Amino acid sequence: METIVLGVEPRVIKKNEAEKLRKSGLVPAVVYHKGEETVAVSIQELALTKLVHSAESHIIDLQFPDGKLKRSFIKEVQFHPVTDRIIHADFQLFSADEIVEMVVPVSVSGESVGVEKGGKLQIIMHSLTLKGKPTDMPEHFVIDITALDLAHSIHVREIPMTNYPGLTIMDEPDAPVITVLATRKEVEAAAEVAS
């Protein structure tokens, strides 16, 4: 997994301070770690937006003004309901051997049998919550869809973990991740064959 350096500035929590930060192109955020005091910081909105909207998960080295780097990942991001701008972010610090839960984007590999038959591929879960060491986390969680047929789905429990030793998927086991929908044409053709 790629490591990104992101500069942060400590901030003071005061009434209306968050709105002033946002107007000046900064995003209020917090940095926390088990057993340590939460630190309020601000981050350049443009840099954070690029990072959040990339299709990969990252380990982030937060760089403080004194030059210290603290290894973290994004735990939560809050968006404005109308403008979709980032209004707040939470970063979780971690140590090398610590077990954490992290959201990782899903990507697919292979050509689905069902799509070749005219079906439509639908990714239902665009990300999965994985538990393990942050250094074991992939940038993408790749799922092979080669055997996925028409009107079938791949559920969380059916995803092989051989390429991801030491990681566990924390999402609901019965949740569908990817499906191939039969189009109206395929449904009508199946009905004609059945009659």
Curated annotation (Swiss-Prot):
Superkingdom of origin organism: Bacteria
GO CC list: cytosolic large ribosomal subunit
Keyword presence, Secreted: no
Keywords: Ribonucleoprotein, Ribosomal protein, RNA-binding, rRNA-binding
InterPro entries hit by this protein: Rbsml_bL25/Gln-tRNA_synth_N, Ribosomal_bL25/Gln-tRNA_synth, Ribosomal_bL25_b-dom, Ribosomal_bL25_C, Ribosomal_bL25_long, Ribosomal_L25_dom, Ribosomal_uL5_bac-type
GO biological process terms held by the UniProt record: translation
Family of the protein in this entry: Belongs to the bacterial ribosomal protein bL25 family. CTC subfamily.
Function statement: This is one of the proteins that binds to the 5S RNA in the ribosome where it forms part of the central protuberance.
Name of protein: Large ribosomal subunit protein bL25
Species this chain originates from: Chlorobium chlorochromatii (strain CaD3)
